[in-house]
Amino acid sequence: VYKRQSSLSEPEAELMQQLAGRVLLVQLSGPMSFGAATGLHRRMRGYQDYDVLVLDLSDVPSIDSSATLALEEIIMTSCEAGHTVELVGIRMPVARVFARLGVLDLIRDCDRHPTRLDALRAAAENLGVATLPATDDGEPGRGAVTATSEGR
């Protein structure tokens, strides 16, 4: 979960500013085990003031079944609370575990994106937040308001 935006690309940081705290961005990294997922689940209970949860799994090479079930619980809880869930970068080994445990059925209701920037753009669109026009290089333009991104 992001407390600071230093590890975000410039376009991602600008989008987070435009979204003004309405998006909770959670980036997971490394192999996911039960302990890591339970800790995340516990920490997630402290975050309720958001509209969209972006779960970035791009840096998760593997996941065990107990961590998968904990992630499923996080997604279900978020959806039941009326939040939109955007998933980023699910790798094939992780997708296989999700499929084996039936979690793919749950995440079919979530939008899936190849990159975090794509997920943030989708969140902005879902929230009706006009994003800055793309520059010649395809990246959003400059200028944004303040934001607080929570977490990590």
Please identify what each model-predicted range represents.
Residues 1-2:
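Short, small-residue-biased leader/transition segments that mark boundaries at the very start
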Residues 7-152:
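Structured cytosolic domains appended to multi-pass membrane proteins
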